């Protein structure tokens, strides 16, 4: 997927969390047989959804729900934390 498509869609969606929600929802609609709103040229559904978002053809019906979504995040693990799959299994 083209980076420019994601960056353009991000400008329209407002933040990356809203973009993910909107892109997934539209991708599912396309997978179920919805008619694409842009020329998809054999692109996968997620790319078509991002292009539609970037072209302002797809948007949230209730954008006020996203007003509380923040871009702030923090890491929940430090360098000493083990990750799932790192442990040795003993039988």
UniProtKB/Swiss-Prot annotation:
Keyword line: DNA-directed RNA polymerase, Nucleotidyltransferase, Transcription, Transferase
A Pfam family annotated for this UniProt entry: RNA_pol_Rpb6
Any GO BP: DNA-templated transcription
EC number: 2.7.7.6
Enzyme's top EC category: transferase
Key word Glycosyltransferase present: no
Record-level GO cellular component terms: DNA-directed RNA polymerase complex
Keyword Mitochondrion (UniProt): no
GO molecular-function terms, A-Z: DNA binding; DNA-directed RNA polymerase activity
InterPro entries attached to this UniProt entry: DNA-dir_RNA_pol_omega, Pol_omega/Rpo6/RPB6, RPB6/omega-like_sf
Catalytic activity entry: RNA(n) + a ribonucleoside 5'-triphosphate = RNA(n+1) + diphosphate
Complex formation: The RNAP catalytic core consists of 2 alpha, 1 beta, 1 beta' and 1 omega subunit. When a sigma factor is associated with the core the holoenzyme is formed, which can initiate transcription.
PANTHER family hit by this protein: DNA-DIRECTED RNA POLYMERASE SUBUNIT OMEGA
Function (record text): Promotes RNA polymerase assembly. Latches the N- and C-terminal regions of the beta' subunit thereby facilitating its interaction with the beta and alpha subunits.
Family: Belongs to the RNA polymerase subunit omega family.
UniProt name for this protein: DNA-directed RNA polymerase subunit omega
The species this protein was found in: Syntrophus aciditrophicus (strain SB)
Organism phylogeny: Bacteria, Pseudomonadati, Thermodesulfobacteriota, Syntrophia, Syntrophales
Gene responsible for this protein: rpoZ
């Amino acid at each position: 997927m083209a980076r420019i498509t994601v960056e353009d869609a991000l400008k329209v969606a407002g933040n990356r969390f809203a973009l993910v929600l909107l892109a997934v929802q539209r991708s599912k609609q396309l997978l179920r047989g919805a008619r694409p709103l842009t020329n998809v040229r054999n692109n996968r559904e997620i790319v078509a959804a991002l292009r539609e978002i970037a072209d302002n053809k797809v948007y949230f019906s209730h954008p006020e729900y996203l007003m509380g979504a923040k871009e702030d995040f923090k890491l929940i693990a430090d360098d000493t934390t083990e990750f799932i799959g790192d442990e040795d299994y003993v039988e």
